[in-house]
């Protein structure tokens, strides 16, 4: 395998060729930075977090594929992944993970001690998550914690503390993550049942759409509370309305529980997050 082919394998292993996960992780992180700063955050902090989100999402993908390397070959959507297809060894994948994790940790060393402490918890959560699919029916809820961990870190980096407002935003993103990752799990539900992977899509069963709606509603409520605490204005409110519109559209897509529409609903959450962040940024700019 030449260098170009090897780089292609690394890109696919870390999902750099599929940025949806990075974007879903980025929007709440950026929102946290803007809320914490009361507008435009410190440039140094912003750059570190943007790079950190990209790297840590890649880390999560690599360790996820390592944990699932013997299962992915039996799932239609994942059987072409580099570890499952044998394009890269388990040892090499672990080395890639360690290098990226070390790089991410070096980034947070440029910030204050509280951020460094929180980052250690974050990397531990990232390593644990892939294995929760073996032992619990609620891995999406654990993922919600992993994918929301950048929020207290962002507040800590910008303000040196993690105020109550941060935890309302954390709760909002946690509920939102459970909702959209359950949509994602609906795509693989039949295959997951065959190979023994657990998920909320399986746990919720015939009530999946209703429970997803409940999590979407809870996320909206927490986003609204975070906005009220920060005294945000009508533009942020417009972002909330847009988020509601996207949530309703996603419910329409998952109504028939078919794979392609469920995956489309999952992808649509990127636009929901982007709309809410842009509204927040404009709200701070205007008010």
UniProtKB/Swiss-Prot annotation:
<comment type="function">
    <text>Catalyzes the prenylation of para-hydroxybenzoate (PHB) with an all-trans polyprenyl group. Mediates the second step in the final reaction sequence of ubiquinone-8 (UQ-8) biosynthesis, which is the condensation of the polyisoprenoid side chain with PHB, generating the first membrane-bound Q intermediate 3-octaprenyl-4-hydroxybenzoate.</text>
</comment>
<comment type="similarity">
    <text>Belongs to the UbiA prenyltransferase family.</text>
</comment>
<dbReference type="InterPro" id="IPR000537">
    <property type="entry name" value="UbiA_prenyltransferase"/>
</dbReference>
<keyword id="KW-0812">Transmembrane</keyword>
<dbReference type="GO" id="GO:0008412">
    <property type="term" value="F:4-hydroxybenzoate polyprenyltransferase activity"/>
</dbReference>
<protein>
    <recommendedName>
        <fullName>4-hydroxybenzoate octaprenyltransferase</fullName>
        <ecNumber>2.5.1.39</ecNumber>
    </recommendedName>
</protein>
<keyword id="KW-0472">Membrane</keyword>
<dbReference type="Pfam" id="PF01040">
    <property type="entry name" value="UbiA"/>
</dbReference>
<keyword id="KW-1003">Cell membrane</keyword>
<dbReference type="InterPro" id="IPR030470">
    <property type="entry name" value="UbiA_prenylTrfase_CS"/>
</dbReference>
<feature type="transmembrane region" description="Helical">
    <location>
        <begin position="235"/>
        <end position="255"/>
    </location>
</feature>
<comment type="pathway">
    <text>Cofactor biosynthesis; ubiquinone biosynthesis.</text>
</comment>
<dbReference type="InterPro" id="IPR006370">
    <property type="entry name" value="HB_polyprenyltransferase-like"/>
</dbReference>
<dbReference type="GO" id="GO:0006744">
    <property type="term" value="P:ubiquinone biosynthetic process"/>
</dbReference>
<dbReference type="InterPro" id="IPR044878">
    <property type="entry name" value="UbiA_sf"/>
</dbReference>
<feature type="transmembrane region" description="Helical">
    <location>
        <begin position="211"/>
        <end position="231"/>
    </location>
</feature>
<keyword id="KW-1133">Transmembrane helix</keyword>
<feature type="transmembrane region" description="Helical">
    <location>
        <begin position="20"/>
        <end position="38"/>
    </location>
</feature>
<keyword id="KW-0831">Ubiquinone biosynthesis</keyword>
<feature type="transmembrane region" description="Helical">
    <location>
        <begin position="266"/>
        <end position="286"/>
    </location>
</feature>
<keyword id="KW-0460">Magnesium</keyword>
<feature type="transmembrane region" description="Helical">
    <location>
        <begin position="95"/>
        <end position="115"/>
    </location>
</feature>
<dbReference type="InterPro" id="IPR039653">
    <property type="entry name" value="Prenyltransferase"/>
</dbReference>
<dbReference type="GO" id="GO:0005886">
    <property type="term" value="C:plasma membrane"/>
</dbReference>
<keyword id="KW-0808">Transferase</keyword>
<keyword id="KW-0997">Cell inner membrane</keyword>
């Amino acid at each position: 395998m030449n260098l170009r082919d090897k780089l292609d394998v690394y890109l696919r292993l870390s999902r750099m060729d599929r940025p949806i996960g990075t974007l879903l992780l980025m929007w709440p992180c950026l929102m946290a930075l803007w809320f914490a700063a009361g507008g435009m955050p410190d440039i140094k902090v912003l750059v570190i977090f943007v790079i950190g989100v990209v790297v840590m999402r890649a880390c999560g993908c690599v360790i996820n594929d390592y944990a699932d390397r013997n299962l992915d070959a039996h799932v239609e959507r994942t059987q072409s992944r580099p570890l499952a297809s044998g394009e890269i060894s388990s040892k090499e994948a672990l080395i890639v993970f360690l290098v990226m994790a070390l790089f991410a940790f070096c980034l947070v060393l440029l910030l204050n001690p509280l951020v460094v402490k929180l980052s250690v918890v974050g990397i531990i959560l990232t390593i644990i998550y892939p294995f929760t699919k073996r032992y619990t029916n609620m891995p999406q809820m654990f993922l919600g914690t992993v994918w929301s961990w950048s929020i207290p870190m962002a507040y800590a980096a910008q303000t040196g503390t993690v105020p109550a407002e941060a935890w309302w935003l954390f709760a909002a993103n946690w509920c939102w993550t459970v909702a959209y990752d359950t949509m994602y799990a609906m795509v693989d539900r039949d295959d997951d049942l065959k190979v023994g992977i657990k998920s909320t899509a399986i746990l919720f069963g015939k009530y999946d759409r209703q429970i997803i709606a409940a999590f979407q509603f809870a996320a909206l409520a927490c986003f609204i509370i975070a906005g009220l605490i920060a005294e945000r204005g009508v533009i942020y409110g417009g972002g909330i309305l847009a988020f509601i519109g996207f949530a309703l559209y996603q419910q329409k897509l998952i109504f028939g529980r078919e794979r392609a529409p469920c995956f489309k609903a999952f992808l649509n959450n990127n636009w929901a997050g982007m709309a809410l962040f842009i509204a927040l940024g404009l709200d701070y700019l205007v008010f």
